[in-house]
Amino acid sequence: MSDNDELQQIAHLRREYTKGGLRRRDLPADPLTLFERWLSQACEAKLADPTAMVVATVDEHAQPYQRIVLLKHYDEKGMVFYTNLGSRKAHQIENNPRVSLLFPWHTLERQVMVIGKAERLSTLEVMKYFHSRPRDSQIGAWVSKQSSRISARGILESKFLELKQKFQQGEVPLPSFWGGFRISLEQIEFWQGGEHRLHDRFLYQRENDAWKIDRLAP
């Protein structure tokens, strides 16, 4: 069998989704209630990085980009993550704040997609979280000019050791180029795998102070 033939075998990789369905009668009025339940179950199932989410943005040419970051907080105002403000994603959000998020809980045969608008967090919010991080992570935030080209990993490691020595006394200061974003909750879609590819999808859309719920075809 040639390498090409082996690659073509991916077309036959599939499985049935058998972990149960999602019914309209079981849905809460508030999508955050269901999100919290699903996130809790993802944690209880000991999934690797249950708070990992794909963040999708677009650049000024409408070219989409995606990357995985960690959810650090959520409430009725939105979902929060932190990043280097000089990063590609931060620049893209500055140009176009429309963002989508995806939580891929494959083991539970579930996905959650969020669509909303990103806004910068206040310095107070950022500082509070920054100083809750492990000290080495705080120093690491100073090291990297995110998304810039570098010639070798050793540059980062040397810079880390240099800054660790510099900041050995007292608190590590908050970098001016480090911050966070809150993604507003405009649409939230819940996907539960189903047998025979008859998956269950429910879309919550915000309408004024309430949520409209629709079942979508798989």
Curated annotation (Swiss-Prot):
Query: Cofactor note from UniProt?
Result: Binds 1 FMN per subunit.
The pathway to which it is assigned is:
Cofactor metabolism; pyridoxal 5'-phosphate salvage; pyridoxal 5'-phosphate from pyridoxamine 5'-phosphate: step 1/1; Cofactor metabolism; pyridoxal 5'-phosphate salvage; pyridoxal 5'-phosphate from pyridoxine 5'-phosphate: step 1/1
Where on the tree of life does the source sit, at the highest rank?
A: Bacteria
> So where does FMN get bound?
67-72, 82-83, 88-89, 111, 146-147, 191, 201
Give GO terms for biological process: pyridoxine biosynthetic process
Key word Zinc-finger present: no
Leader sequence range is none
Residues noted as binding substrate in the record, renumbered to the chain: 14-17, 72, 129, 133, 137, 197-199
Database matches in InterPro entries: Pyridox_Oxase, Pyridox_Oxase_CS, Pyridox_Oxase_N, Pyridoxamine_oxidase_dimer_C, Split_barrel_FMN-bd
What Pfam families does the database record attribute to this sequence? PNP_phzG_C, PNPOx_N
Q: Which cofactor does it need?
A: FMN
| Residue ranges of coiled coil | none
Q: Which UniProt keywords apply?
A: Flavoprotein, FMN, Oxidoreductase, Pyridoxine biosynthesis
Per UniProt, the enzyme's principal EC class comes to: oxidoreductase
Task: Quote the catalytic activity from the record.
Answer: pyridoxamine 5'-phosphate + O2 + H2O = pyridoxal 5'-phosphate + H2O2 + NH4(+); pyridoxine 5'-phosphate + O2 = pyridoxal 5'-phosphate + H2O2
Q: Any idea of its EC number?
A: 1.4.3.5
Q: Name one GO molecular function term.
A: FMN binding
Explain the purpose of this protein: Catalyzes the oxidation of either pyridoxine 5'-phosphate (PNP) or pyridoxamine 5'-phosphate (PMP) into pyridoxal 5'-phosphate (PLP).
Family the entry assigns: Belongs to the pyridoxamine 5'-phosphate oxidase family.
Quaternary state and interactors:
Homodimer.
The name this protein goes by in its record: Pyridoxine/pyridoxamine 5'-phosphate oxidase
Task: Tell me the name of the encoding gene.
Answer: pdxH
